Amino acid sequence: MARFDYSNQVTGKDIARGRVNEAPISPKHAIEIAGFIRGMKLDDAAAYLEGVVALQKPIPFKRFNRNVPHRKGLVGWDAGRYPQKASRVYLRLLNNVRKNAEYNGLEGDQLRIVHVSANRGIRRRSFMPRAMGRATPKDRQTVNIELVVREQEA
């Protein structure tokens, strides 16, 4: 069996980590969300992603932005989307990291995201039913996400 390790070796007693393996979400959406929440406070990132799930706040698409329309409310960028499914996975991960931090004795309101990465996972083979009893093969993409937070001094 393969062993997983974090790509960024952040060490110290003031960090907490979390990881999601093989999440069935779009890799492009996961990469854009990772680039957006990197460097944010944990509570601010969670509040913003809840707004994305409610279709109130868009995520700016800076890399995968071909044929992506403009969104009202984006500052410093014009193209954006509302990746709800990926945002729900990130919210679960942020909640997991917050609980890991509390278990390690860190304060939840002073946590800042220092590392987040989204990498393509394995492809799961599936089949899409077609007419006349045929089936078309289709690959389902997965994503591996890792997140590290550090307690910041007030």
Swiss-Prot record:
One of its GO terms (biological process) is cytoplasmic translation. Coiled coil: none annotated. InterPro entries: Ribosomal_uL22 (IPR001063), Ribosomal_uL22_CS (IPR018260), Ribosomal_uL22_euk/arc (IPR005721), Ribosomal_uL22_sf (IPR036394). Keywords: Ribonucleoprotein, Ribosomal protein, RNA-binding, rRNA-binding. The keyword rRNA-binding applies. NCBIfam families: PRK04223.1 (NF003260), uL22_arch_euk (TIGR01038). This protein binds specifically to 23S rRNA. It makes multiple contacts with different domains of the 23S rRNA in the assembled 50S subunit and ribosome. Belongs to the universal ribosomal protein uL22 family. HAMAP family: Ribosomal_uL22_A. Part of the 50S ribosomal subunit. This is Large ribosomal subunit protein uL22. The lineage of its organism: Archaea, Methanobacteriati, Methanobacteriota, Stenosarchaea group, Methanomicrobia.
